[in-house]
């Protein structure tokens, strides 16, 4: 089975903010970035296409010619809960952040998720796809989702997740047995 993972294009917010599941705007360069993704996907025929329901993914899927993608909550970005749209500098002064910064794999953000939580929901979704019998699929999602999918495929360990977040507009092909 082949899975094409597509990360949304650049977001139009200041660097250094935890934005997770917040529906943030895309940069004015969206069309140029999206055109590059569209060219990469050109010629591929997918058995099924999914998208995170967040606008930054849906808009890219639409631009690339997939207006009828199935929206899937399990491929949303990690939830930073109460920390959504706060700067990392601001979070470092939150007394609850020490535990998270020391063990972000297992400790959730307040009212949010841990990386393990996100990995669990993404891996359940990928298990369903594997069991479906589909041969070639495409998923428009987020950096954290693409990273979790690559961990699922055995490319690296969850501890290495933040070292391997793909760039905006990246297309990654995974081959699963």
Segments predicted by a language model, with ranges:
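Phosphate-handling substructures
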Residues: 64-121
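Glycine-rich phosphate-binding loop signature in dinucleotide/nucleotide-binding domains
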Residues: 42-45, 129-135
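Domain-level recognition of soluble alpha/beta enzyme cores
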Residues: 156-177
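A glycine-rich beta-strand to alpha-helix segment
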Residues: 135-146
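Short, hydrophobic/glycine-enriched beta-strand segments
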Residues: 2-8, 139-140
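Active-site signature of alpha/beta-hydrolase-fold catalytic machinery across serine-
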Residues: 63, 148-152
